[in-house]
Amino acid sequence: MARYRCCRSPSRSRCRRRRRRCRRRRRRSCRRRRRVCCRRYTVRCRRR
């Protein structure tokens, strides 16, 4: 199981904001932007 890095930027707030954005979008979008999504969300998105 490959784990994706949460966010390259050290700011967590930015990561949360991006995770929210990913959460709102559909799976396909989330998959395409998995680099932007947080690790937890990416894993969830991947499972589905």
Swiss-Prot record:
<dbReference type="GO" id="GO:0005634">
    <property type="term" value="C:nucleus"/>
</dbReference>
<keyword id="KW-0744">Spermatogenesis</keyword>
<keyword id="KW-0238">DNA-binding</keyword>
<comment type="similarity">
    <text>Belongs to the protamine P1 family.</text>
</comment>
<keyword id="KW-0158">Chromosome</keyword>
<comment type="function">
    <text>Protamines substitute for histones in the chromatin of sperm during the haploid phase of spermatogenesis. They compact sperm DNA into a highly condensed, stable and inactive complex.</text>
</comment>
<protein>
    <recommendedName>
        <fullName>Sperm protamine P1</fullName>
    </recommendedName>
</protein>
<keyword id="KW-0539">Nucleus</keyword>
<dbReference type="GO" id="GO:0003677">
    <property type="term" value="F:DNA binding"/>
</dbReference>
<dbReference type="GO" id="GO:0035092">
    <property type="term" value="P:sperm DNA condensation"/>
</dbReference>
<keyword id="KW-0226">DNA condensation</keyword>
<dbReference type="Pfam" id="PF00260">
    <property type="entry name" value="Protamine_P1"/>
</dbReference>
<keyword id="KW-0544">Nucleosome core</keyword>
<dbReference type="InterPro" id="IPR000221">
    <property type="entry name" value="Protamine_P1"/>
</dbReference>
<keyword id="KW-0221">Differentiation</keyword>
<keyword id="KW-0217">Developmental protein</keyword>
<dbReference type="GO" id="GO:0000786">
    <property type="term" value="C:nucleosome"/>
</dbReference>
<dbReference type="GO" id="GO:0030261">
    <property type="term" value="P:chromosome condensation"/>
</dbReference>
